[in-house]
Amino acid sequence: MANYGFVIDNRTCIGCHACTVACKSEHDVPLGVNRTHVKYIEKGIFPDSTREFSVHRCNHCEDAPCTTICPTTALFNRSDGIVDFDDERCIGCKSCMQACPYDALYIDPNKGTAAKCNYCAHRVENSFEPACVIVCPVEAIISGDLEDPNSKISQLVMNEDTMVRKAEKNTDPNLFYINGSNEMLDPNATNYDGNYFCLLYTSDAADEGLGV
């Protein structure tokens, strides 16, 4: 049985938001909320400054706290590793949002129910890759079967120095980062010390500016 996951290669991500736009288009995600978003970190002092990017979304955890706490089983672990949701069962109680350590869930303002990245399950079931993977111009998002030792994603996880977000939560996430850092992966690590600036493009204004 497959066990699907993602690798985000921070060495190549250029922060173009193609993944965010593709996800919104694929799933009709409303303004003001995102299933996937890009985090920016500015480091240094101009002109010796740098900008780093990192894509954040549902981690598709094997031990997902959102599925455990959901009172209606609207969120559930599939046998292929994808954490999916059924908005017809959701009652909008926001328990999943409180339980998720990755801030991956939101309430759809049009439906009043929880939503998040579901690995484009409808595409995967028809042998297509998730929309974000297809559109990334630098192939910074890699998807695939973690149980297949010959898959690209398995090779990257085995051979590269990968990190996961909030490993101390013991959620066993299926989302791995290459060239990650505490500042990129943990919002609590970005306490301002004058050397970097964190920016998340998740607001209504940012969405409108991007035309998404």
Which residues are covered by each model-predicted region?
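Short Fe-S-cluster ligation motifs
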Residues: 45-61, 97-104, 122-134, 160-180
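Sequence context of c-type cytochrome heme-c attachment sites
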Residues: 3-9, 25, 33-58, 74, ...
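Solvent-exposed, charged amphipathic helical/linker segments at domain boundaries
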Residues: 112-121
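Short flanking/linker segments adjacent to small metal-binding domains or redox-active Cys/His motifs
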Residues: 66-67, 175-197
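Conserved small/polar residues in nucleotide/adenosyl-binding loops
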Residues: 201-206
